């Protein structure tokens, strides 16, 4: 069963890298993925919220702090699982492949944590926030630097930690 799940994961990655591959989309997603490194876009959004919403500043700062907390937790899981980045014969990743481990995706984890935490503060924007997080997660296998299961696990970790952290403040 595990072998068939891994094979399905690999096949989906191959399909993303071959059948759906478009140069312009790759460039746009690579630029967008850069904003997700270390959760920087989510931290910046939460800090901007803290600047403009003084009444709820502490909650915004808590949201900003939740992103690196999620990154740290995600790193711990990577060290336990130790899954290597995808290497597909004849199908190169877009840009440089990070030297770090693959499972789970930190981009997905920090994006879903950020969307969850910020979404508690601006409920009308939740669909857009989760859409932005989903696009960030999608970018990773599309660019060839993660398996689809890496981003699913990262999204789950980010959502769960985001909800836990939101409940703690």
Predicted regions and their residues:
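Small-polar-interrupted transmembrane alpha-helices in polytopic inner-membrane proteins
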Residues: 64-80, 127-139
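Alpha-helical transmembrane spans of integral membrane proteins, capturing the lipid-embedded, hydrophobic core
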Residues: 43, 63, 67-71, 155, ...
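Membrane-water interface at transmembrane helix exits
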Residues: 49, 74-82, 119, 162-169
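Transmembrane helix-loop junctions in multipass membrane proteins, especially transporters and channels
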Residues: 54, 79-87, 145-149
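Interfacial segments of alpha-helical transmembrane regions
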Residues: 48-72
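Membrane-helix interface segments
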Residues: 24-25, 55-59, 87-88, 122-128
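N-terminal transmembrane-helix/juxtamembrane module of multi-pass inner/ER membrane proteins
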Residues: 1-43, 74-100
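Membrane-embedded catalytic cores of phosphoryl/pyrophosphoryl-handling enzymes
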Residues: 90-169
């Amino acid at each position: 069963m595990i072998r068939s799940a891994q094979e399905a994961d690999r096949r989906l990655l191959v399909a993303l890298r071959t059948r759906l591959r478009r140069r312009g989309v790759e460039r746009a997603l690579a630029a967008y993925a850069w904003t997700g490194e270390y959760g920087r876009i989510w931290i910046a959004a939460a800090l901007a919220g803290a600047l403009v919403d003084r009444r709820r500043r502490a909650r915004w700062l808590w949201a900003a702090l939740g992103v690196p907390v999620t990154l740290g937790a995600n790193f711990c899981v990577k060290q336990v699982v130790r899954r290597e980045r995808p290497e597909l014969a004849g199908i190169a990743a877009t840009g440089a492949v990070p030297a770090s481990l693959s499972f789970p995706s930190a981009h997905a984890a920090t994006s879903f944590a950020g969307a969850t935490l910020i979404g508690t503060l601006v409920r009308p924007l939740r669909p857009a926030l989760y859409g932005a997080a989903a696009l960030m997660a999608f970018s990773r296998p599309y660019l060839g630097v993660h398996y689809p299961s890496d981003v699913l696990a990262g999204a789950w970790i980010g959502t769960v930690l985001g909800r836990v952290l939101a409940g703690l403040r």
